[in-house]
Amino acid sequence: MDWLKRWFTRKDQDKTETTSASKRAKITSSLLMFSALYEAKKPLKYTIVYILALVNAFFLLVFIQQTGLYSFGISSLTQGFARLLFVLLKNLEDGQRNLVFNIFYWLFYVIVNIPLIIFSYKKIGKRFTILSTHYVVASNVFGFIFSIIPGANQLPSMLSAVHHTEFWEDAKKAEGVDQSALFVPFLWNDTSQGNVIISTFIYAGIYGFVNGTSLAILYILGSCAGGADFLTQYFARKKNRSVGPILFYVNTFILIIAILMGSFVAGSIVLQDIPDYKKSAWQVNLFFSPNLIATFFSVLFTGTVVSHLFPRYNFAEIKVFTDKIEEVRLALLNDKATHSLSIQETMGGYSLAKKRMIVSVTMYVEIPNLIRIIRKIDKDCLVSITRIRGIDGYIYLRSQD
């Protein structure tokens, strides 16, 4: 019987060890990327804005200006106009021609933004507009400075192969074509441009990711990239929902006009001076070029990245399990923003003791602020966050300015 007693004793000990193997651990996960930036202070905001402006200027120069692609929105108009102007001013010296091109490509966009900046100041708010204006001016001034550096007009490495295509060989033989040939969209029927077209899509994807990330961070900081973004932010804040589909159509219309100017018309003018390619001028396939498709690919990729990194109009339910229920409640009530707030009765699963928890429905972007307030009162409480697929009714939203 001793062996039986020892066996049961060992089993009991094993159970105890298994139970004691469980330990209390702190788990932290976030529904938001760059969550720390939602509460960034003013000096940090401006520092990040200028860094983003510098990065965007570089990528815009290398991945858009030099590749025949376009940005999205109003900036595409100034880009298309600058390309058309470059082709038309072929009688100017190269230095003057490039200077005029860069002024209209970069600095003219700042001028176009002036009425939109005034609109934003009156309709959206002071802080938002000032921060956005810093970005608009800085990114385009940086871009202009980069563009006038000697050698800045050199093609990216993967696109330099365009100089070895059949089209480029014929363009070099034509009189007065020179750099204007770079503004001719890639041609579907020129098999020698196959590798260059693939490279263009790669560059479009890279720029789409970088641009989407930059835009998301700007939105998180409480600013935008200017242009049509001012209108986007105004309608989004007024309607308290994303107006992406409507603005996508508006920006697409603007982009089509830009491509008509900077690629279709400008490209056709250049092709008329190249004997073997005269027939390609003013053809429909010149408009529906690889450049157009790659541009839309970049735009869609940008939108996808922004939606993932800045889910502004997504909602979540927050449950706070704390023994300091009254202190947390008062802290939330004393916050500058009004939060939806309810208290529910619960029962402990082990002790069967009655407890209470705080429940709040809020936007994703408000979660870091709520957790910060709660943690000031109770560093050890459990905060549960659940995504909400849909919502219908009134809810308190923090003022944006």
From Swiss-Prot:
InterPro entries in alphabetical order: DUF2179 (IPR019264), N-reg_PII/ATP_PRibTrfase_C (IPR015867), UPF0750_membrane (IPR051461), YitT (IPR003740)
Keyword Membrane carried by entry: yes
Residues that span the membrane, as ranges: 44-64, 69-89, 99-119, 130-150, 201-221, 246-266, 286-306
Chief place of localization: membrane
Coiled coil (residue ranges): none
GO CC list: plasma membrane
Keywords, in A-Z order: Cell membrane, Membrane, Transmembrane, Transmembrane helix
Membrane topology annotation: Multi-pass membrane protein
Name of the molecule in the record: Uncharacterized protein MG443 homolog
